[in-house]
Amino acid sequence: MQEIELLPSSEQDNRYIHQQLRQYNRQFMRDFKDYSFHIKQDGQIVAGIVAASTMDTLEVEFLFVEESCRGQGLGRLLLEQAENLARQDGCKRVLLNTYSFQAPGFYRRMGYELLAQQNPCFGEYSQYYFTKNL
């Protein structure tokens, strides 16, 4: 029997695992396309979105705006860019999830509909699952 080791993962390990999962999923979920973008200000990344589509659905994995840059429309700009490009490529909907300490109100203002809410999820926090038709 081969020896196995159970080890904590580094960021590099996590990237490899994520890459392998995406590669595996592509066998079943065709037309995979990345819609990830970032915004730089004075040479520093201050906002970014990590999103990808498969078949006719765009999934937003992460949307982040530096605290000092919030309220300037950067999140809206990133989300609309991903939505518009995905729509042009034939996507029909967007899926995402967020937590009560993040931005559920932002997604509602952006036209997202609540699919499900888990209360509580992590301690006192709730988790929200949203969708939007494109």
Show which residues each predicted segment covers:
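Conserved catalytic-core motifs of GNAT/GCN5-like acyltransferases
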Residues: 95-97, 113-129
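Conserved GNAT acetyl-CoA-binding A-motif
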Residues: 86-99
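A short, internal acetyl-CoA/4′-phosphopantetheine-binding micro-motif in the GNAT/acyltransferase core
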Residues: 63-70
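Conserved acetyl-CoA-binding loop-helix of GNAT-fold acetyltransferases
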Residues: 71-84, 109
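Acetyl-CoA-dependent GNAT
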Residues: 2-61, 101, 120, 133
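Conserved short alpha-helix immediately C-terminal to the canonical SAM/SAH-binding motif I
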Residues: 78, 102-103
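Conserved active-site tyrosine of GNAT-family acetyltransferases
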Residues: 17, 107, 112
